[in-house]
Amino acid sequence: MDALQALVLGALQGITEWLPVSSEGQTMLAMISWLGMRPTDALSCSIFLHTGTMLAVLVRFRSRLLGMLNTESKLMRTVIVATLFTGITGVPLYMLFRDRFTGGEQATLLIGSLLIATGLMLRLRSSSTKDMEEISTKDMVLLGLAQGFSILPGVSRSGTTLTVLLMRGVKQDDALMVSFIISVPAVLGAIALDCLAGSPLSIRSLPGAVMLASSFITGYATMDVLMRFSRNVSFSWFCITMGMITLALTALPEVQ
């Protein structure tokens, strides 16, 4: 892998990480078809790419994360509970499917359809939405269980968690913020699992640094665009738009 390839892969990760499609699936497909990597190597490299977007979250939400140090913070409780239940589904699935790469198109199509259905239901009825402080323990548990399934290549972590939060009535800007922040322990856990499983991947220092920088910059920019977008559209139209983006991006490989 040279520096230019690393730059492209990092940008692909940064752009797709926060969209309701699988960044892991997209980067793995690129590495397998473009670079000729083995699926296990591509999975390890895809997990490594998440480090850049994780750093983007830490920088973008540094004030909120510092506020989490208060043990009574609702955000802190949400992160802890969601992370625990992510492990319940994520660890067994990782161990079972690490060597079996699947595209996950059906899961992505389901996520897109659910987002559109949620938006349409909200258009038909008046619905109050919850802010961060109103998220319940049940919301946290469902969020964590859903995030665990995103360890599978092709299943979108952001799409899955965003769908759960929106269907539970959480405001779109809070839903995005929570989805971004709970990715941090999820990424750290995935990296630890990959290392414990004996990751076969060895990345040279220059391509590795380029991938991290590229995924960080594009990930930060994409996050900022989505947060601005969420504040300027209605709750229902936000769901419908994100669902349509999901379905459109899922169809792209078929067109190509």
UniProtKB/Swiss-Prot annotation:
Any GO molecular function: undecaprenyl-diphosphatase activity
TM segment ranges: 39-59, 77-97, 101-121, 135-155, 176-196, 206-226, 233-253
Catalyses which reaction(s): di-trans,octa-cis-undecaprenyl diphosphate + H2O = di-trans,octa-cis-undecaprenyl phosphate + phosphate + H(+)
Pfam families assigned: BacA
Matching InterPro entries: UppP
UniProt membrane topology term: Multi-pass membrane protein
UniProt-listed Enzyme Commission number(s): 3.6.1.27
Places the protein is found: Cell membrane
Superkingdom classification of source: Archaea
Entry's Gene Ontology cellular component terms: plasma membrane
Alphabetized UniProt keyword annotations: Cell membrane, Hydrolase, Membrane, Transmembrane, Transmembrane helix
Job of this protein: Catalyzes the dephosphorylation of undecaprenyl diphosphate (UPP).
Recorded family membership: Belongs to the UppP family.
Record-given protein name: Undecaprenyl-diphosphatase
Annotated source species: Methanothrix thermoacetophila (strain DSM 6194 / JCM 14653 / NBRC 101360 / PT)
Encoding gene, per UniProt annotation: uppP
